[in-house]
Curated annotation (Swiss-Prot):
InterPro entries linked to this entry: KH_dom-like_a/b (IPR015946), KH_dom_type_2 (IPR004044), KH_sf_prok-type (IPR009019), Ribosomal_S3_C_sf (IPR036419), Ribosomal_uS3_bac-typ (IPR005704), Ribosomal_uS3_C (IPR001351), Ribosomal_uS3_CS (IPR018280)
Keywords: Chloroplast, Plastid, Ribonucleoprotein, Ribosomal protein, RNA-binding, rRNA-binding
Domain KH type-2: 47-118
Organism: Atropa belladonna
GO terms for biological process, alphabetical: translation
Cellular compartment(s): Plastid, Chloroplast
Name under which the protein is recorded: Small ribosomal subunit protein uS3c
Subunit details: Part of the 30S ribosomal subunit.
An example Gene Ontology molecular-function term: structural constituent of ribosome
Amino acid sequence: MGQKINPLGFRLGTTQGHHSLWFSQPKNYSEGLQEDQKIRDCIKNYVQKNMRTSSGVEGIARIEIQKRIDLIQVIIFMGFPKLLIESRPRGIEELQMTLQKELNCVNRKLNIAVTRIAKPYGNPNILAEFIAGQLKNRVSFRKAMKKAIELTEQADTKGIQIQIAGRIDGKEIARVEWIREGRVPLQTIRAKIDYCAYTVRTIYGVLGIKIWIFLDEE
């Protein structure tokens, strides 16, 4: 049986860049890594609490962290930044204060920037959140997958594969269902493929959603 490698790690340095950009001594590396995780979790929790969205999509595509000795620069790539900014007029400042408290950064400045991504539904994280919202509302998984594929087609991608695993539709036996539209060349390294794995808690148990999106070839 073929073993699947993570498409993002497989393409690092060719079509994929790192989401954290900093250097540290080997003995301090683990602290830096934990700090990154803390920043990402804190931002996601804040957005979840303070954004009231009808579709259940928070719309965070990715969070990039750049560190220097005296500065931490956090760039949040969002599909719908208006929702965050409109729901709280001082949303970004509040988030910055929360993060500073959480990290306890005394002699370092923290900077947060929010960047809008052009085609939100061309991003697997946002799409996975959309599918998760549908499954929580007990929409049948096939309908949710088809709707997601329609949304990505509007975002002008070359191919998409969606996989849902777990107790689908509340069935006793867990199974894996998947659907593919267009091309998804996972073994071609120069193919720009975006990927995300997302867990969703439904009343029947946990479902895993995986999404591969083939954007273009270099």
